[in-house]
């Protein structure tokens, strides 16, 4: 039997998720379009093997169950909606530009809070401050992470820890508008749809998840990373009007070679055959579109929201890079103060009105 014939139907996967959350409600049907497009692409384009079928079903089940559970928590505790996400910082840019290393460095600052793997993959029940580092889900997620070929390959090229910073794919996946799937499978029609669709509903659920995660664990500033955020900058700013961005940079040719290698080593275990030409074309297209969208967004009056960091600088002087970002943020705060005519000291510097602009 062909592996694709073993794939459960959408109705079967929906029923499976609902059986795990009795009385659950998906909170609308906006997610269905993305899942329909994904399923059609998988059946007609992906050429996945049995491992790929299991990995796909597991991802779909996780996203549906998380959506059901989050919606249930909001229904039982409507006060969660009153949570405020204060000045989140999104790491954006091309794939393979150092966002993972950067996220681990930024996560050391107690003022920051990263989206952590175990919280992204199993957000319910929402974590509490007193158990952020000893929640039993940490050990459970740690066992699951190496089970797929993708996770194993990533561990060789990227540090992945259950209690370490995660990409936002798990939150956006609840709307099935996530680059997660094009990183797993060769599905050009889903990719084209994702390029053209409205991503704001996905960030609505992204925000719902963050509010839930900080409801019992108050947060000063979220540090969020995912190269696919670069494709959705207007949607992010619509959802988070006070957002700021760290843009990471690298020679595009090296970035493309690196991501093709990563995808092949990881997701290649999910395919019946490997189409290297497709990988090269597809990721060149993705990187080109990421750059075009970021340039257009910055040129549209949003350049002041960005802090730029080149991969070479991050590798050569990681702490210096972080200090430069921290000082930049401090300078912006100081400028806001001196605009009122007030003078304050920051370290060895005195900021005076009009001297430093954000």
Where are these regions (language model features)?
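Conserved acidic-Pro-Pro-aromatic motif
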Residues: 323, 327-357
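Long, basic/Gly/Ser/Thr-rich N-terminal segments
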Residues: 1-78
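Post-Walker A helix-loop "phosphate-sensing" segment adjacent to the P-loop in P-loop NTPases
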Residues: 108-118
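Membrane-proximal basic amphipathic "stem/tether" segments
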Residues: 1-4, 11-12, 348-358
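PAPS-dependent sulfation machinery
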Residues: 121-222
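Short, glycine/charge-rich beta-strand/loop segments that flank catalytic centers
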Residues: 74-96, 119-125
